[in-house]
Design a protein with these regions (language model features):
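A non-catalytic alpha/beta surface segment that caps or lines the substrate-entry region
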Residues: 1-8, 25-54, 58-62
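Histidine-centered divalent metal-coordination motifs
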Residues: 17
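Active-site beta-strand-loop-beta-strand hairpin of nuclease catalytic cores
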Residues: 9-13
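Short acidic/His/Gly/Ser-rich catalytic and metal-binding motifs that mark active-site loops
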Residues: 21-25, 72-76, 148-150, 204-209
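Short alpha-helix boundary/capping segments
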Residues: 27-35, 85-92, 219-226
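Active-site-adjacent substrate-binding region
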Residues: 137, 145-240
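Acidic/histidine-rich catalytic neighborhood of metal-dependent amide-processing enzymes
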Residues: 1-2, 52-163, 177-185
């Protein structure tokens, strides 16, 4: 179930997902495995094209198949569990969205969307952009706000120029989403929205995601207030 609240007729939506999960394979390993699988798939296609010109011995294909299988094992082993309470991923994002909305002037037109099933293929976000009856506008998706680490702006598909202009120069330069990593912003970008994903953390943050260590003993919430203030300030300034 997605939770939706609006003030006025919003042209900007603040988004965060509510669900959490645990997985036995770290997210970094999964991303590397997906990237490696795509690389070896490209190599196999190149070898297939070369075979039209030069015969290839069978062992080449056997070796490629074995390497591709090994590369895909971490992905196949990434079963979903419930050992993570999801303090960082993504109670912190939901808290940031609600706090930013609270800080904005009461007459600000804004939409708030708290999605479900992000951890299950972005199902909640994809259902909402498909069936919610909202024409594509702009969204800020908040996913993972740690107490320490760098603030990051992440995008998929096209560069969200107008969103970056709204945020201003005080924010970091955006980076493309790592292959194999999914965020609700992907569902919005696929549906034609202009969207920026916002995260704060470090490699230590990434190691906690989807593990039993993602709990309140490892998160105080200071980053939530910091990012919410920064978001609300940028949104309010853009409307003056």
């Amino acid at each position: 179930t997605n939770l939706v609240a609006t003030r006025g007729a919003p042209m900007l939506w603040l988004v965060a997902h509510l669900d959490s999960k645990s997985q036995p394979i770290p997210i970094v390993v999964r991303a590397l495995a997906i990237s490696a699988s795509l690389i070896f798939l490209g190599v196999a296609m190149g070898v297939g094209f070369a075979q039209l010109l030069v015969p290839m011995p069978p062992f080449v294909w056997h070796a490629l198949a074995a390497v591709e299988l090994l590369a895909s094992l971490p992905v196949m082993m990434s079963v979903v569990g419930a050992r993570s309470v999801g303090a960082l991923d993504n109670a912190s994002g939901a808290a940031t969205v609600l706090r930013a909305a609270e800080l904005l002037p009461r007459d600000s037109s804004i939409g708030v969307l708290l999605t479900s099933a992000e951890e299950l293929g972005l199902a909640g976000a994809r259902a909402w952009v498909r069936d919610g009856g909202i024409a594509p506008v702009s969204a800020l998706n908040i996913d993972g706000v740690d107490d320490t680490g760098e603030l990051r702006l992440i995008y998929s598909r096209r560069l969200p120029d107008s969103m970056l202009a709204m945020l201003g120069d005080a924010w970091p330069k955006p980076v493309a989403l790592v292959p194999g990593v999914l965020m609700d912003g992907v569902a919005f970008a696929d549906a034609g929205w202009e969207v920026v994903n916002v995260s704060k953390g470090s490699w230590s943050t990434v190691r906690r995601i989807h593990t039993a260590s993602d709990d309140l003993s490892h998160l105080e919430g200071s980053g939530v207030e910091e990012v919410a203030l920064k978001l609300a300030g940028a949104i309010a300034a853009s409307r003056r």
